[in-house]
Amino acid sequence: MMKQILALALIIGLFPLFSHAQNNNGIYIKLGEARTKKSLMAFPPLQYTGSPSTASRNQGVGVEIFNTITNDLTVSSYFQFINQSAFLEDTSKTGLMPAPGLPNGFKFQSWSSIGADFLIRAGYSVVGNEVTLETYTYHVPRAALVLGKKYKGPTSSARRIAHTFANDVMKALTGVEGPFLSRVVVSSDKGSGQSKEIFTMDWDGANMEQVSNHRSISISPAWSPDGKKIAYTSYVKRVGAKFRNADMLLLDLTTGKRSLISYRQGINSGASFSADGKHIYLTISQGNSPDIYKMGLDGTLVGKITNGPAGALNVEPTVSPQGLLSFSSDRAGRPMIYTADAAGNNVKRITFAGVFNSSPSWSPDGKKIAFAGQSDNNFDIFVMNADGTGMIRLTSAKKPNGRMASNEDPSFSPDGRFVMYTSNRTGKNQIYISTVDGTEERRVTNDNNNYYKPKWSNNID
């Protein structure tokens, strides 16, 4: 779909003020600064720049784009939007670019007077089934154009165009692309009674789609690095088998082909793709206790990564972009988090507190690990450095009955700024996200279904 969206850089040399007004290092917001002071963002409603006769029937497209951009940048935690009632200009009567270069252009003074750090001016037009979004992002104190781009695509891709622009804004202002073109894969009982199926959705919970229909228990999904494949475990009924088994399947989202890749008797679960997408790390319980194996996408075992000790459970492998492994093991008596190299050597225990530590998740830069830790009768989400130091707690919430809620199954966003997880604080397992320092938390799903083990993809083209 992304190939249908063309991002075209605008020619800004017509306005000499902008051609040389960039920040010297290209970064306007240093990562971490928003924790103490959010930048004030002014974002007037989108202007309709197409034929006036088509404005009314295409208003919904503009509203969808505006709302999506606003939500993305709000969730980023770097911006606070200025209420439109504080605007000093009638933005429906001023152009998207400033005066005097544009005769009816806006005045930077009108925006600096209300304290705006950044200003987004944007317009859109619709011809047939194609929408064009024209955007200008300004740094008000410097009267500088930071980003000018046009985006084109089918009206059905309006949200995706908005997500693309929001990603570009984050890249232009912070130097790091946003996570807004990412997707989430999750197991849920949505619409399936007692069974669980696999679903995908946008990072913000929109566009949810069921991608399995086994009428069974399908769990523990994982994305390939390119977002084109999903591995998951399901208790499918195989022809000729007397019992259902926890088998692993691989779904190719491009072709729709679904392959049974690991069906060894016992557990075949906990998939995590290697950084190059050519292998899967998983837990297999052939023999006695579950151990972690490395497997090709065709199901061929490449090697056994963990080997006991006898009676120990080695589960939930996760692989960093640098190829390091983290997993949960009870080899010391209680389930704790361990790390190892890709071959299973240099094993190190990195958590020592709590009753039960599980579900490790690497940050995209390989510097941090999130996990779920149980202290009393509930789990919470923690983030620590990859060596176990610098641990912080992200979650602490109560249910309506006053008991502590459980927060589980963390997964890092592709930019490393957020952690996604499930929480039963409402009585149902819902999906939430938190900034990596725990200062801001938002609910993603809001329904009466249960969600389990969400996994955040990379940004998907």
Curated annotation (Swiss-Prot):
Gene3D superfamilies: TolB, C-terminal domain, TolB, N-terminal domain. Keywords: Cell cycle, Cell division, Periplasm, Signal. It comes from the Bacteria. Residues 1-21 form the signal peptide. It is found in: Periplasm. SUPFAM superfamilies: TolB, N-terminal domain (SSF52964), Tricorn protease N-terminal domain (SSF69304). The Tol-Pal system is composed of five core proteins: the inner membrane proteins TolA, TolQ and TolR, the periplasmic protein TolB and the outer membrane protein Pal. They form a network linking the inner and outer membranes and the peptidoglycan layer. Part of the Tol-Pal system, which plays a role in outer membrane invagination during cell division and is important for maintaining outer membrane integrity. This is Tol-Pal system protein TolB. It comes from Bdellovibrio bacteriovorus (strain ATCC 15356 / DSM 50701 / NCIMB 9529 / HD100).
